[in-house]
């Protein structure tokens, strides 16, 4: 196998992984989505921020709870509900414009919330936060992931993938 073939295969793998991740992504409060109903400008919205309950208000349908649903599932829900007396054959597209932020604290130079980017690893998240302080441990990293009802604490490494809503804490190292 040539170097060129290996590079092409690697690029395809990365692209397919990020596409799969986007398809599996579950919406929650703080996400910003766009809804496009083809041919229906009054039902198309370029930017909707999900409220604290993970919901948004939509014409004719009222409050739509998107929390825990994938963008594809929200498309199907809106399509089904618009077919019920409003449109004959609605074509709906839902896409994520901005993911909810992740949070990083502890021994980083600039702790706080940062915008999530698909494929973000912990080492890149640390770089976004200005890098590690002099006292930081690159081995004592905890990551809290999950919803309000079920939160999991994970011992993380620098190659761990970060997800939207994650809370990362970098502990001090022992010298």
Language-model segments: which ranges?
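Bacterial N-terminal signal peptides that target proteins for export
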Residues: 1-8
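Ser/Thr/Pro/Gly-biased, low-complexity, turn-/loop-rich segments
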Residues: 2, 20-175
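Short, linear, compositionally biased motifs with a strong N-terminal bias
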Residues: 12-13
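N-terminal signal peptide c-region/cleavage motif recognized by signal peptidases
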Residues: 16-18
């Amino acid at each position: 196998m040539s170097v060129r073939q290996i590079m092409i295969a690697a690029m395809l793998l990365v692209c397919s992984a990020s596409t799969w991740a986007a398809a599996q992504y579950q919406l929650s409060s703080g996400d910003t989505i766009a809804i496009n109903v083809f041919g229906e400008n009054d039902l198309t919205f370029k930017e909707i921020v999900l409220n604290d309950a993970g919901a948004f208000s939509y014409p004719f349908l009222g409050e739509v709870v998107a929390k825990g649903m994938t963008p594809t599932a929200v498309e199907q829900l809106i399509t089904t509900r618009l077919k019920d007396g409003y449109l004959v054959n609605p074509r709906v597209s839902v896409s994520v414009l901005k993911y909810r932020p992740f949070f990083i604290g502890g021994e980083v130079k600039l702790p706080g919330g940062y915008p999530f980017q698909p494929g973000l690893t912990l080492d890149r998240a640390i770089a976004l936060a200005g890098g590690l302080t002099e006292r930081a441990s690159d081995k004592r990293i905890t990551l809290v992931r999950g919803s309000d009802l079920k939160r999991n604490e994970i011992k993380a490494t620098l190659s761990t993938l970060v997800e939207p809503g994650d809370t990362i804490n970098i502990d001090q190292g022992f010298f």
